[in-house]
Structures are given as structure tokens and as C-alpha cells.
């Protein structure tokens, strides 16, 4: 079989877990994906099988859409909800208009330092492995383009 499989990845699974399952089910080792989703993330994971692997770079260069849930006023050591809370801040006077203004400031093209808790590899090793070992490493810079951003709802 050659082609793509669209999988709705569940929470608490790595993208690699999904690839391994597909490898076993299809009895092939030529399986990959078009982009890692964090283990706590759920959503579409595009799986490429055999000859379709040649098209992965073309697909990863396309625009993507994300829906994210954000908790304001908390900073963690992993930059996500799974980490240890380092700081808490009172956000009672932050309103919807302010949040929309901040979100809109992200629209455009810019360079972003890749977070240390990331599957991006440096010297053949995933950044989150360096972070878990307490080792510092020069973080790569990635070009980011945000064409549109929309606030769907605010819960108090």
C-alpha cells in the first residue's frame, strides 16, 4: 500500500506511537508523518506510507490550522500544562479585548526560537531530551508565519 492515512490522534499518545501502530498493522517499516503533535495534543496526524513518504516535505510546507486552549496567568517549566508551575499571576483585570489585541500582534512572519521542550533535533538528539537531562544547548531558530488568528471563546 502506498498513500496517506489521516488519523485523529488521541491525547497521551506520541506521533511515534501512531507510526508504530500503522507499521505493525500494514506490515511495513516505511511509515512516517508530516509533523509531530505533542503527546497531550489531539488532532489530525497525516501518516505517509511507502512511496507517499517522498511527498512529506511538500505537505509539511503547506499552511496549517490549529485550535488551541490556553490558560493565562501560569508559567511552567515545560511551557505547557504538563509542567511544574513556576509562576502564577493575577489575571482578573484582563479582558477579551486585551486578549484579542495580544493575539493579533502575532500575525505576520517572524523568527522564533524553538522551545527546549520540543521534538526538534539538534546533533541527532531531541531538544526535550536535553531539557530532561538539564543540559543546555543552542536552540535553533524557526521561521513562523501566522496569517490569521481568532479568539473563539473566553472562560473566566
Task: Specify the residue positions occupied by each region the protein language model found.
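Catalytic/RNA-binding core of pseudouridine synthases
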Residues: 1-156
Amino acid at each position: 500500500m502506498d498513500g496517506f492515512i489521516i488519523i485523529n490522534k488521541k491525547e497521551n499518545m506520541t506521533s511515534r506511537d501512531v507510526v508504530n501502530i500503522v507499521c505493525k498493522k500494514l506490515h511495513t517499516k516505511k511509515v512516517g508523518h508530516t509533523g509531530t503533535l505533542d503527546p497531550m495534543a489531539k488532532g489530525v496526524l497525516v501518516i505517509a506510507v511507502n512511496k507517499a513518504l517522498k511527498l512529506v516535505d511538500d505537505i509539511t510546507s503547506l499552511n496549517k490550522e490549529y485550535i488551541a486552549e490556553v490558560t493565562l496567568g501560569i508559567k511552567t517549566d515545560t511551557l505547557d500544562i504538563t509542567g511544574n508551575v513556576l509562576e502564577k499571576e493575577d489575571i482578573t483585570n484582563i479582558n477579551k479585548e486585551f486578549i484579542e489585541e495580544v493575539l493579533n500582534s502575532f500575525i505576520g512572519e517572524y523568527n522564533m526560537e524553538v522551545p527546549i521542550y520540543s521534538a526538534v533535533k539538534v546533533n541527532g538528539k531531541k531538544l526535550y531530551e536535553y531539557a530532561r537531562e538539564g543540559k543546555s544547548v543552542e536552540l535553533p531558530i524557526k521561521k513562523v508565519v501566522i496569517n490569521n488568528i481568532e479568539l473563539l471563546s473566553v472562560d473566566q
